[in-house]
Amino acid sequence: MGEEEKKPEAAEEKKMEEKKPEEKKEGEDKKVDAEKKGEDSDKKPQEGESNKDSKEDSAPAAPEAPAPPPPPQEVVLKVYMHCEGCARKVRRCLKGFEGVEDVMTDCKTGKVVVKGEKADPLKVLARVQRKTHRQVQLLSPIPPPPPPPEKKAEEDKPIVEEKKVEPPVVVTVVLKVHMHCEACATEIKKRIMRMKGVESAESDLKSSQVTVKGVFEPQKLVEYVYKRTGKHAAIMKIDPPPPPPPEEAAAAAEGEKKEEEKGEGESKGEEGKDDKAKTDEEKKEGDGGKGEGEAADNGGGEEEGKVVEVRKIENPYYYYYYQPPRVAIPPMEMPPHAYPPQLFSDENPNACTVM
């Protein structure tokens, strides 16, 4: 019995020993919290005292007066004004302009003073220059210099390959122009020399030809001559001849190649075609005789049956009469007036003599 009573007592002692270190830790934590609260409470009265001192120092200071507004910006321009009317015109064009509050002009010195905080000097300058049509200078404020150009933009631009420009070809053109006198030849030569690109022009009155030398298109020269002189011109000769365009030159080269290939193929196939050609000729001769006979039979009849009407006589009589005037009612045909009968005429020796 004694041992059983000792066992629960030993278990209780162990529990008490385990609780003691936990209680010690809790006590230490409480002490640390209390110390922190004490420090905070000490700081608060110090801050309050400092705030009170600052309020006491600021209280006796007098309130500061508000700063005066800055004067409005002045724009000074130089404009030529020879009378009060010019000055009035300048003031009127700037009155009510954006940002302008007041305008003062001085005709003697030629200065215009524009007051306004939001007035843009460059816009005011452009306004006066546009309205007065005079040269205007901006004396103040001096506009800032333009920013330097960005080098990056130049670097970013793609490099363009320079195309080789071929030198212009000097062309000599002979034109056929009708000229009936020396004045015509001189006038045509003078007009042609005014065309751009023409170096020289020579006119020949006997052959009615004009020789033109220079850098130009022959077709445009013909159009220019007709436009300036009213005379039709024809191109007789071009020296040197103009080169064909690239598309036509390529097509011509391809055509030459095809012709060469065809020539080689034809030379190979000529031997085989000789026999066929002979047989074809014999057949054609046989068919040709029949065709000629049929053509003779049919063609002869057609030629005989054709009647060519040279002139058709509308009026069967051999005399004429005046046409009636045009009226709304269709005209009536008048009976034709015949010649008097010659049967009983005294002038006709072959007339009847039995009277």
From Swiss-Prot:
One example GO MF annotation: transition metal ion binding
Record PTM Cysteine methyl ester, positions in chain: 352
All copies of domain HMA, residue ranges: 72-136, 170-234
Biased composition annotated in UniProt, kind: Basic and acidic residues: 1-58, 254-293
Region (Disordered): 1-74, 132-157, 235-308
Pro residues: compositionally biased ranges: 63-73
Covalent lipid sites (S-farnesyl cysteine): 352
InterPro entries: HIPP4/7/8/17/18/19, HMA_dom, HMA_dom_sf
Proregion positions: 353-355
PROSITE patterns according to UniProt: HMA_2
Pfam short name (any one): HMA
Keyword Signal attributed: no
Residues that hold a metal cation 2 according to the record: 181, 184
UniProt entry keywords in alphabetical sequence: Lipoprotein, Metal-binding, Methylation, Prenylation, Repeat
Domain of life: Eukaryota
Record note on modification: Efficiently farnesylated in vitro.
Similarity annotation: Belongs to the HIPP family.
Biological role: Heavy-metal-binding protein. Binds zinc, copper and nickel in a reversible manner.
Name of the protein in its database record: Heavy metal-associated isoprenylated plant protein 7
Gene expressing this chain: HIPP07
